[in-house]
Amino acid sequence: MFKTRKNRILEYADLAPLAYLHIALNGNNVQSYVKHLLIDEMQDYSPIQYKVIQKLYPCRKTILGDASQSVNPYGSSTAAMIQKAFTTGEVMKLCKSYRSTFEITSLAQKIQANNELEPIMRHGEQPEIFPFKNAEEETTGIVNLVSDFRNSGYTSLGIICKTETQAKALAQKLQVHTDNISLLSSQSSAYTKGIVVTSAHMAKGLEFDEVIVPQADNQNYH
């Protein structure tokens, strides 16, 4: 029905629209044996993907997620968008944050405010912001932070870049200056604990004792 490119590969973003067209033109094979569908990370699915899901699985659903944790603004959904796909749904908001300390939550609120968020009073170290004049100075600063981490007694450090391309480039730079730096990419077959350089997309679901966010400026995160 659909013509692929010469390499016979379809883009991920095109799959749901093509599936929706296929269902509209040829009908859909309803998966009636599924009685209740649970969807996690709701913010990572686009509205058209939810339309396809509704066509294939007309059963009751529980959809969970956090719109603030979306890593792809061009292929994501807010709670309001999901309500348009499931018009009879009921929305329940859980506003108390248990995962992060009060200090981390307060910093996050300065970056992206959420007036409904209620942080718990679990305190920890204040996040530090280090200004650097250029990329070379930043690399040196990260190497020093890695050295401090190794003397801290903690076991996991995540160096989280915006994109996988940035993560690969930074990992190569750091590996010149220090040992035991692992790159976690879409090609990785396993997650290695310790000091990990990765992208925001790959870091979803992972937890670290300490985190470094390089290139955290308006030019990179615009």
Regions found by a protein language model. Give the residues of each.
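Conserved helicase motor core of SF1/SF2 NTP-dependent helicases
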Residues: 23, 27-36, 43-222
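Coupling/switch/interface segments within P-loop NTPase motor domains and analogous charged loops
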Residues: 1-16
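Short, hydrophobic/amphipathic alpha-helical patches that form generic packing surfaces
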Residues: 12-27
